């Protein structure tokens, strides 16, 4: 059984940093929004069965897309139906991040909220 986990959140909240930590990848990170412009997939390191895939999605503020990057993220979350979503939230600006969190909760899929400082 394979498991697919999506990393979702606002731009520049730490999604790619978490992706790199979980997968052992070395994807480029920057301290500004818009660094990740396409989805990236990797296997969780240390998982002997090699059956857990993590998907790093471009940053989005809501499930109502305005940019190409937001369309990529929205389509993956709604159409690919990941087994779970890790919603990364910038703990320094929680209020701005919660709109997306509420939308993700309404999808009724397993979700973890991860606060990042």
Where are the language model's segments positioned?
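Conserved C-terminal guanine-recognition region of P-loop GTPase G domains, centered on the G4
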Residues: 44-49, 72-117
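Conserved G1/Walker A P-loop phosphate-binding module
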Residues: 1-68, 79-80, 84
């Amino acid at each position: 059984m394979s498991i697919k986990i999506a990393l979702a959140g606002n731009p520049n909240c730490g999604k790619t940093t978490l992706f790199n930590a979980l997968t052992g990848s070395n994807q480029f990170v920057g301290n500004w929004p818009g660094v990740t412009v396409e989805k990236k997939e990797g296997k969780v390191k240390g998982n002997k069965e090699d059956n857990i895939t993590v998907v790093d999605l471009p940053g989005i503020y809501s499930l109502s897309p305005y940019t190409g990057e937001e369309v990529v993220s929205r389509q993956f979350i709604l159409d690919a139906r990941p087994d779970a979503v890790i919603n990364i939230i910038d703990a320094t600006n929680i209020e701005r991040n919660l709109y997306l969190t509420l939308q993700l909760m309404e999808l009724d899929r397993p979700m973890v909220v991860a606060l990042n400082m």
